[in-house]
Structures are given as structure tokens and as C-alpha cells.
Regions:
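Surface-exposed, low-hydrophobicity beta-strand/loop segments enriched in small/polar/acidic residues
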Residues: 1-141
Length: 141
């Protein structure tokens, strides 16, 4: 799960929220990174995250619910865990898992978004990292 560690602007402890329409037949978890596609919330996975989900919700096939999400910006520092051991260092870019709720510790695949590591509390699976949303996209080697 991604949680908000701090906001670097010095004015507020948490970013603003907004309500975003759900995508049909999608399961959202509190702490998952969210992207917007066709005006609806989707799990960020390999897309650029713009929001952080604040509730657990499973959307039905013709659901019209709106989930509440924090708006993420460059000054929002997040805390999460690694799904696997990593050799990445501070400033490195980590992919996020398919449920968009943890960093994998793997480098970004070509054309995919992830998170920038701000600090590592550890490098083993289950260790915590501090990170922020990245504008960088993985490139081929």
C-alpha cells in the first residue's frame, strides 16, 4: 500500500482530494496508485499515476460510483514496500506492481511509468522505500 509520508510544500499535510468515476468491473484498494483513462479511474500499473486511492471499492459492470482520491504532485512523498529485493538506489526509478499498491524494485520497462526512489529504508523484499511519482518513462537499453 502506498501512503502519504509528507508534502514538501510546507503548507499542508495532505494533498487535496477529488472524486473520480470508477471503471466497470475494477477492484480498487486503499493506497493504490490511480491513473485517469477516458475520464475514469484505472489502476496505474504501468501508466503515470496522478492520484492515490483512499478507499476499498469493487465496481460492478455498470457502476456509477465515484472513488475519493488524493491528487498527487511532484512534492508528495509516498511510503511503500518492495515486492522483491532490489539493487536500485536513491534517485532510481522502480516499476510498480499490477495492483498498483507496491513498488517492485525492478527498473522501468520501455515506455512504462513508475516511482522515483527518494530514500530506501532497506533493499530486501518487504523493506520500505520513500518515493514520488515520476515523469520519467523507461527506455530501452
Amino acid at each position: 500500500m502506498f501512503t502519504i509520508e509528507k508534502v514538501l510544500n510546507g503548507r499542508i499535510n495532505h494533498p487535496e482530494t477529488e472524486f473520480i468515476p470508477v471503471t466497470a468491473s475494477t477492484t480498487y484498494k486503499k493506497g493504490a496508485l490511480i491513473a485517469i483513462t477516458s475520464g475514469k479511474a484505472v489502476l496505474a500499473g504501468s501508466k503515470k499515476a496522478t492520484h492515490l486511492c483512499t478507499e476499498d471499492y469493487t465496481a460492478g459492470a455498470s457502476d456509477t460510483h465515484h472513488i475519493q482520491c488524493f491528487i498527487l504532485s511532484d512534492d508528495v512523498i509516498l511510503r511503500t514496500t518492495l515486492t522483491a529485493d532490489t539493487s536500485l538506489v536513491k534517485g532510481g526509478m522502480s516499476a510498480i506492481n499490477t495492483t498498483a499498491d507496491e513498488a517492485t524494485g525492478a527498473a522501468l520497462a520501455t515506455g512504462k511509468y513508475g516511482v522515483e526512489i527518494v530514500d530506501l529504508i532497506g533493499t530486501k523484499a518487504g523493506s520500505e522505500i520513500l518515493c514520488k511519482i515520476s515523469d520519467a518513462v523507461g527506455a530501452s537499453a
